[in-house]
Amino acid sequence: NIAITYAYEPKQIAEEISLITEELQSRTVDITNMEQQGIDGNTDFNFNPVCVICDEIILMKLVFPDKLYKETLAKINAIIVSGRSKNIYAGLISQSGLAEYFGNSGIRGNIGLKVALGQMSASEYSMIFGTEYADVKNLRYGEIGSGLIMRTGLDSRPREFVAPYIKNHALD
């Protein structure tokens, strides 16, 4: 079963995030019950995957009422911090890596894949990849889809990344 929901109004987005947070809580209860029945906690519990993609997190901060933004961001943070073990994932897309758009900067340490496309400032690279990588540079700046990537558990530091470029007529 695959369900795709597209929400674009602040209230709709908040409702969808709330539903995913409820699913996260439900799976937490399910795991606790299974562990009490003697099922190993390191087992794959075969939960269907759930992915939430928050495109343009900056825009959320700008258009959401302040209280709704803070509540929604707290729920997104909860998904990022504890969702992976329950097969629930969050993707945050932003044109800026500045901390003011991501709330609690502690969530950045829990993000498993970080991609920075284009050329960013040293402070943005520092906020995305960590202070020890403030000096990294995208050497292919100007090339469409070029940037840096860092994958938790696979990369020891940001490395070059070029996203595939698909021309519109190639899809015809």
Tell me what each language-model feature is.
Residues 1-33, 50-51, 57-129, 137-138, ...:
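P-loop NTPase catalytic phosphate-binding loop
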Residues 35-39:
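Alpha-helical multipass membrane-protein architecture
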Residues 41-50:
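Short basic/glycine-enriched coil/helix segment immediately N-terminal to the Walker B
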Residues 44, 82, 141, 152-155:
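A generic structural signal for short, solvent-exposed coil/turn residues
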Residues 75, 107-115, 143-172:
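Conserved P-loop NTPase motor module
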Residues 131-147:
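P-loop/Walker A phosphate-binding loop and immediately adjacent motor/lid segment at beta-alpha junctions
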